Amino acid sequence: EKGTIEERTEPKKLFPQAQSIISIALAYPTKLKNAPRNTAGNRRGIFSRTSWGEDYHVVLRDRLEKLALFIDSKIDDFECKIMVDTGELSDRAVAERAGIGFSGKNASIITKEFGSFVYLGEMITNIPFVADKPVEDTCGDCRICLDACPTGALVQGGQLNANQCLSFLSQTKVSLADHFKQKLGTRLYGCDTCQLVCPYNKQVDFHLHEEFEPDPEVAKPLLKPMLQKSNREFREKFGHLSGFWRGKNPLQRNAIIALAHFKDDSAVDVLKEVILEDIRPVIRETAIRALGEIQTERARLALDKVSEQVTEAPLIEEIEKALAKYRQGKIS
């Protein structure tokens, strides 16, 4: 997290003229129009809804800058400092105090109008605007999100164990433990489970901002082509998404995990090519493990083939583990 404790809790440390903070929330869509089908041989992954459409950091900053220009046209000597997600302040803490919504047990701000499917941003200003009142927390005894979390990352009271959270894990660049890979499933970036099950999000689907309208082929992309794109092609396809901020490594790793989840025999040749030609250890290791999960004769033969060419000891060990699964299981 950015900044010191003082900077994250005392706005005047960031903006000496601070008198008030304006918090904004923009709703984003939750349903894909004309979503492409996920079929055998053409398997697809899914980006979380926070990464549909144009990068929300860009859009919210644009809205805040326009708001600042409007206020400046009405008030002399207006000054402000704009933040969207990457600033020192906690967007959620600011939004909660501003009355945008309350902090739910799913660690999200829940609004009356739009549920928790909102992006947050704020500006510190030198104008003493009248403060709004916080919204009452109405989660009550409900614990649907806590029980639904795939990894048990949500703790009672709206706290989150980030090291268990699939959204956080999907953005890391390391090899994932097998139990986390199984839980990740077809997720390429982020996780929406704790929001989708929330009663306040029932039938919530707002298409109010054109920039957030998703391209179905980007939000739910084919998996195999994700492993065959050059850096330039990958950026052209996904570079405008907020989910691209960590680069292509986590996304390609997660695409491989998704192919393993589907036990997609049609991906064997692509995975073999990754193992033999890619230079990234995590990507190669994940591909080896994927061949071990697919459990088909073609996948076993591919492992035999790569075992003859791979020379790195850690990868040789992974190949042996993958082949051992074939000796233990049934090949389809």
Where are these regions (language model features)?
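Structural detector for internal amphipathic alpha-helices that build alpha-solenoid repeat scaffolds
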Residues: 252-264, 273, 284-296, 316-330
